[in-house]
């Protein structure tokens, strides 16, 4: 396998600093410390990193008066044209005057480094709140929808002098909305995809003067790519920018928060109508997420026109029975939480190849992500399923999942250990969404994923010749917990799924032999070898379930590490073992059944 083909195996470096090479992690920490030091020298206190994305890093600091500010730094490794976008963002932010939008303060350029300074939005972003709470309550969603509707109205009615000059945010999603639950204030942040709209909601060109209408640019788009998990079809396909883009972002956001997902793609299988929302509100959201443009636009118009009336409906909290997880998981309370990363294999069968969509030149960070994360030739439900697996990895959880689609049924095997009992309800919502999305997939095949702690990842560096550099070999750690023999029916085998067509790394036979021996000992775990030209990464977790076998178990783990230094090939290969056969069977289901908020909640 050539070095170039390694890009087929995508374990996102952004997921954890622990997956960076020692050199890159050191550079990353140094750079963050330089930024913090610079801000401290300018007199700001309590400087902290509060976010990072494809284009830059975001820090917060407090000045002596107590005012809280945000500083957005562009990544200096990006092309100048991309770095210039931070200045564009600063300009667009300076044009907006709305209580839901943080106040612009200044833009500075220090050598190659652009820095945008603005007021800090109070509260926590809705993606984080969603991960902690699970599905948001109908009352909170309707309240949020009204606030977002008001912002959309303000943006589309914006004027430059006497002329209409609508603004498009272009990247509305849960992580770009900050909610201060004490004051119930929402803030719409991150204006990096914002542009002036080229066409209005009716598809007519917007022009502040006759020269704009005569311009040749009227046929080409000025739109910027927002988050590919939330933007609508028109923005994704490069249509001219329109206020309709933000209607799509709002619908995607409400839908994701209502369903405990991190994307818009699941609406065909888990429609808003199945999420316990008020009937009128649910139908509007489903309409806005429709595949038909006429339906979408009509629903968007209805949303803008009728949201104030919908928000007046009395929506008290109703006591619902606690949701039961469709597949079991264990919880333990630990102070040192895992930094979870997911590795998925056997994704190929989810793809629907479209050779007209071959990517030749990716120069957009979001598009790059779209292609790398297997989204460009999969159906919406498959995209939603893969996104739901990624969402599970946002929890402090280790374990494995195996989904097997057969003619009439879906079979799921699992071993999941959640390391924070306080997240049990939210994690249940995320797990159940994953299973429901899997029920909606029609292709027959097998999908496996491992969730491991990146803090435990072992990295062996290589020199220019490919030889490994180490003073002494590290050890594979494991935990021990005893499971009664009566609980074991037929242990899951490392080998029962056969060879994975997605994995190209040829492992030495001695490692395979060790894994074969390990397979005879009752345990759960996974080990993934990710072989790169400059280093070998070993991602793993192990839990021994038969304490009497500990001597043999630890000896085999030592042998595996000794034989890893004979890996010469490039690529990824891995093994996963679930603790015992506890297969759950589900019927395939193309759409979850309708469930609205009750007409009379007092009954």
Model-derived features: where do they sit?
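ATP-binding glycine-rich loop module of kinase domains
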Residues: 61-83
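Regulatory extensions appended to serine/threonine kinase catalytic cores
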Residues: 315-438, 442-457, 464, 468
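Catalytic-loop of the protein kinase fold
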Residues: 156-180
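AlphaC helix of the eukaryotic protein kinase fold
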Residues: 78-95
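AlphaC helix of the protein kinase catalytic domain
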Residues: 126-136
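Terminal C-lobe "cap" of eukaryotic-type protein kinase domains
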Residues: 294-295, 301-317
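Short beta-strand micro-motifs within the conserved protein kinase catalytic domain, predominantly
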Residues: 103-114
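Juxta-kinase regulatory segment immediately upstream of eukaryotic protein kinase catalytic domains
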Residues: 2-40
């Amino acid at each position: 396998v050539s070095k170039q083909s390694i890009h087929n195996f995508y374990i996102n470096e952004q997921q954890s600093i622990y997956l960076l090479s020692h050199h890159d992690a050191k550079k990353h920490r140094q750079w963050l410390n330089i930024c913090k030091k610079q801000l401290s020298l300018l007199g700001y206190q309590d400087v902290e990193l509060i976010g990072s994305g494809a284009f830059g890093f975001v820090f917060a600091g407090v000045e002596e008066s107590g005012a809280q500010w945000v500083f957005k730094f562009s990544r200096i490794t990006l092309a100048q044209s991309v770095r210039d976008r931070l200045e564009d963002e600063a300009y667009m932010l300076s044009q907006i005057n709305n209580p839901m939008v943080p106040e612009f303060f200044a833009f500075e350029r220090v050598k190659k480094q652009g820095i945008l300074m603005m007021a800090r939005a109070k509260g926590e972003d809705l993606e984080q709140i969603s991960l902690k709470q699970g599905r948001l309550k109908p009352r909170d969603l309707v309240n949020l929808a009204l606030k977002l509707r008001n912002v959309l109205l303000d943006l589309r009615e914006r004027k430059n002098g006497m002329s209409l000059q609508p603004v498009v945010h272009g990247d509305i999603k849960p992580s770009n909305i900050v909610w201060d639950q004490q004051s119930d204030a929402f803030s719409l942040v991150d204006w990096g995809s914002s542009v002036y709209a080229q066409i209005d909601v009716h598809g007519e060109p917007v022009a502040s003067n006759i020269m704009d209408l005569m311009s040749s640019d009227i046929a080409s788009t000025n739109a910027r790519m927002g988050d590919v998990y939330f933007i609508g079809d028109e923005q994704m396909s490069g249509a001219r920018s329109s206020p309709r883009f933000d209607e799509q972002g709002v619908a995607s956001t409400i839908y994701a928060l209502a369903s405990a997902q991190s994307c818009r793609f699941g609406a065909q299988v888990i429609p808003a109508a199945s999420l316990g929302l008020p009937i009128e509100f649910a139908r509007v959201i489903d309409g806005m997420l429709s595949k038909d443009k006429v339906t979408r636009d009509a629903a968007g118009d209805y949303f803008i026109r009728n949201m104030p009336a919908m928000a007046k409906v009395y929506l008290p909290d109703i006591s619902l029975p606690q949701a039961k997880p469709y597949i079991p998981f264990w919880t333990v309370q630990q102070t040192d939480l895992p930094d979870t990363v997911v590795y998925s294999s056997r994704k190929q069968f989810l793809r629907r190849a479209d050779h007209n969509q071959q990517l030749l030149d990716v120069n957009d960070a979001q598009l790059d992500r779209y292609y790398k994360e297997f989204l460009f030739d999969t159906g919406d439900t498959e995209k939603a399923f893969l996104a739901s697996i990624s969402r599970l990895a946002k929890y402090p959880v280790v374990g494995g999942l195996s989904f097997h689609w057969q003619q009439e049924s879906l079979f799921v095997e699992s071993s999941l250990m959640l390391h924070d009992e306080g997240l049990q309800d939210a994690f249940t919502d995320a797990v159940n969404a994953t299973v429901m999305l899997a029920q909606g997939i029609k292709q027959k095949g097998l999908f496996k994923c491992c969730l491991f702690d990146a803090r435990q990842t072992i990295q062996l560096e290589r020199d220019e010749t490919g030889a490994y550099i180490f003073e002494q070999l590290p050890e594979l750690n494991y935990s021990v917990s005893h499971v009664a023999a009566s609980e074991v029916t037929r242990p899951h085998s490392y080998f029962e799924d056969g060879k994975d067509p997605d994995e190209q790394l040829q492992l030495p036979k001695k490692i395979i032999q060790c894994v074969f021996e390990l397979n005879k000992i009752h345990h759960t775990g996974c080990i993934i070898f990710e072989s790169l030209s400059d280093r070998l990464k070993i991602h793993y977790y192990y839990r021994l379930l038969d304490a009497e076998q500990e001597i043999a178990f630890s000896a085999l783990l030592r042998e595996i590490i000794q034989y890893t230094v004979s890996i010469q090939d490039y690529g990824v290969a891995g093994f996963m073992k679930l603790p015992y056969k506890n297969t759950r069977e589900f019927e395939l289901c193309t759409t979850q059944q309708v469930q609205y908020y009750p007409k009379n909640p007092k009954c």
